[in-house]
Amino acid sequence: PYFILMKTLGLLNTSIGLIFAYSVTALPLCVWMLKGYFDTIPRELEEAARIDGCTQFQVFWKIIIPLSLPAIAVTALFSFLAAWNEFLLALTFNTSNDNYTLPVGLASFISPTKQLWGDFAALSIIAAIPIVFLFIIFQKYLINGLTAGSVKG
């Protein structure tokens, strides 16, 4: 049904189609992770801000979001990793070589007629470099965010 939907909407072999597919698959994980964290934020903080004269948007923007940065960073990183490493949807929704994603392109180095293991290994290392940089940049949020929302009370 997913392939038929993408074909009907004209989203096969397009970047927009992959963005749509990755967003739809990442959304449940993001909602589940962030809900667990938002449940741990005390309601008293929101109520105190409302008493001090903040609007609902100000409460969200100035109190909830800053407190939620670790959870948002972890959720964003997990979603990015899922899309970065995803193979099956990219292979299914892209039938031309022009729109291959990194994992599908890497898989093309190994076939029954040729095995370019050296090239495959080198490109795998190069593909890991952006992930390593992201983990270094978000390290302080990751340490706090991985356990955030796991224990309530």
Report each predicted region and the residues it spans.
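A structural signal for multi-pass alpha-helical bundles of membrane permease subunits
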Residues: 1-153
